[in-house]
Amino acid sequence: MFTVFLLVVLATTVVSFTSDRASDSRKDAASGLIALTIKGCCSDPRCNMNNPDYCG
């Protein structure tokens, strides 16, 4: 019974680790999209004035 428990824990850990690595690439893509959006905002004077904390 203990062996089955260890196998379940190991399988859960492997699945969790793999899905975490996959979500990291999605986070990178999202942060790149956000950066492009902010750059577009900073080039627009009205948006730049409304968001000085992003456009510095």
From Swiss-Prot:
The keyword Transferase does not apply. The modification Cysteine amide is found at C55. Does not show activity on alpha-7/CHRNA7 nAChR. Both tyrosine sulfation and C-terminal amidation are important for activity and structure stability. Residues 1-16 form the signal peptide. This is Alpha-conotoxin EpI. Its main location: secreted. It is found in: Secreted. One of its GO terms (cellular component) is extracellular region. Keywords: Acetylcholine receptor inhibiting toxin, Amidation, Disulfide bond, Ion channel impairing toxin, Neurotoxin, Postsynaptic neurotoxin, Secreted, Signal, Sulfation, Toxin. Pfam families: Toxin_8. Alpha-conotoxins act on postsynaptic membranes, they bind to the nicotinic acetylcholine receptors (nAChR) and thus inhibit them. This native peptide blocks mammalian nicotinic acetylcholine receptors composed of alpha-3-beta-2/CHRNA3-CHRNB2 and alpha-3-beta-4/CHRNA3-CHRNB4 subunits. Residues 43-45 are annotated as: Ser-Xaa-Pro motif, crucial for potent interaction with nAChR. The keyword Ligase does not apply. Transmembrane segments: none annotated. Expressed by the venom duct. Residues 17-39 form a propeptide. Disulfide bonds join C41-C47, C42-C55. The cysteine framework is I (CC-C-C). Alpha4/7 pattern. Belongs to the conotoxin A superfamily. The modification Sulfotyrosine is found at Y54. GO terms for molecular function: acetylcholine receptor inhibitor activity; ion channel regulator activity; toxin activity.
